[in-house]
Amino acid sequence: MFHFTLQKNLGWLLLISVLMATPVNAHTEKVSNDVGGMLHIEPHDNAEAGKTAHVWIVLTRKGGQLIPLAQCNCQLAVYPQPHHETDTPLLKPSLHNVSTKQYKSIPGADIIFPKVGAYELELSGTPKSGASFKPFVLSYPVTVGS
């Protein structure tokens, strides 16, 4: 039988509150139809309110083949959380090519989140002429700190 004391209860409460308050955004992976996407946020995988966050998403087809921005009619939308499917996005940042040490010409954007809180980034895309992947929608939860 478990015996709970005030000290144990406060310890659990502290642990749970720390876990809930800690942003967990680093390299979030999602899949939609035959497209996978891995979100990356700079600086240091944490967005800060009022500061520019450099966001990019590595898109791959099933099997691992990279989908560059040049092959995708991609759109990025930022929603505050919670939101409804019919809500207008808070932001619709324009996408540009991002190249890193490992990836070339992937979709990226610079985003300034207006305040601390929970947001959802939604990347949708359809193939441009000559590309062969199914239309997709990838949604990523993002916690913005101060």
Language model: regions and residue ranges:
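Bacterial N-terminal signal peptides that target proteins for export
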Residues: 2-12
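Bacterial N-terminal signal peptides
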Residues: 11-21
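N-terminal soluble domains immediately following signal/targeting peptides that reside
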Residues: 23-146
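Extended interaction regions within the primary functional domain
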Residues: 1, 19, 88
